[in-house]
Amino acid sequence: GVSAVLHGSLVAYSNDVKTRLLAVPPEILAAHGAVSEATAGAMAAGALRFSHADWALSITGIAGPSGGSSAKPVGSVCFGWCGPDGRVEVETRIFSGNRESVRQQSVAHALEGILGRAVTLES
């Protein structure tokens, strides 16, 4: 089953959960906001430490239909990946579509990202 490859998951909508459980520094949230590459990277690193897994990923974004701004429009999604070597990689994408479409595209991109990184590292 999935327990062979998934150690766990955490939904960290609130900044409080991000800081308490994932050890995202409050300074990062204050300076960059919850939807940022800095936050996504810190979330992935914290998830790896928290879970003792080989890999961790994070997704933070604005799926809509509201909540966007000119700097961070609806569809803005930041990703973080952290692997066994401790290196954190981040990326931002802007997806189009409704809330469900943005969520589906985000999940697909995050999983493709971790799979590609895991295969590359093992090569």
Regions found by a protein language model. Give the residues of each.
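Short alpha-helical segments enriched in small residues
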Residues: 1-123
